[in-house]
């Protein structure tokens, strides 16, 4: 059994659409990023890479490589998951927490879970996504940024029960 942790934070300030967990969320501003800025996917990729001791998202998809400019982060997730499948790992559990003062995430969480379930070929019950605020503290509290924490548990050569 392997456990990995990932974190990402992006500031608001882009004209890009706000996409979190592969879901388009209505918002007047997007997140500043080289890719499409899907910080949930980015933190999840880092957790998967951490669990398999394969490095971090930047080592696979460097921000100075134009090929990844504005790329759909779900494509990046699928590329990483395909590498992990070759190592005979399966997902036991994914636990994700989004920290955002704005916009509210609750109406979109089911769709985020559905996207991850599809992309990672795992049961939706293996995926937990929660959201909270920073109690109006710091850059997140001032609605300048959104952060995300992800934890992944993988098992090799068999399915989790």
UniProtKB/Swiss-Prot annotation:
Keyword Transmembrane helix: no
Record bears the keyword Metal-binding: yes
A Pfam family that the UniProt record links to this protein: YgbB
Cofactor needs: a divalent metal cation
Swiss-Prot/TrEMBL GO biological process terms: isopentenyl diphosphate biosynthetic process, methylerythritol 4-phosphate pathway; terpenoid biosynthetic process
One of the record's GO molecular function terms: metal ion binding
Site (Transition state stabilizer) location in chain: 34, 133
Enzyme Commission identifier(s): 4.6.1.12
Pathway per the UniProt entry: Isoprenoid biosynthesis; isopentenyl diphosphate biosynthesis via DXP pathway; isopentenyl diphosphate from 1-deoxy-D-xylulose 5-phosphate: step 4/6
Top-level taxon: Bacteria
UniProt-annotated binding residues for 4-CDP-2-C-methyl-D-erythritol 2-phosphate: 8-10, 34-35, 56-58, 100-106, 142
Assigned keywords, A-Z: Isoprene biosynthesis, Lyase, Metal-binding
Cofactor comment: Binds 1 divalent metal cation per subunit.
Binding positions (a divalent metal cation): 8, 10, 42
Record's catalysed reaction(s): 4-CDP-2-C-methyl-D-erythritol 2-phosphate = 2-C-methyl-D-erythritol 2,4-cyclic diphosphate + CMP
First-level EC class: lyase
Protein function: Involved in the biosynthesis of isopentenyl diphosphate (IPP) and dimethylallyl diphosphate (DMAPP), two major building blocks of isoprenoid compounds. Catalyzes the conversion of 4-diphosphocytidyl-2-C-methyl-D-erythritol 2-phosphate (CDP-ME2P) to 2-C-methyl-D-erythritol 2,4-cyclodiphosphate (ME-CPP) with a corresponding release of cytidine 5-monophosphate (CMP).
Similarity field: Belongs to the IspF family.
Assembly behavior: Homotrimer.
Protein name in UniProt: 2-C-methyl-D-erythritol 2,4-cyclodiphosphate synthase
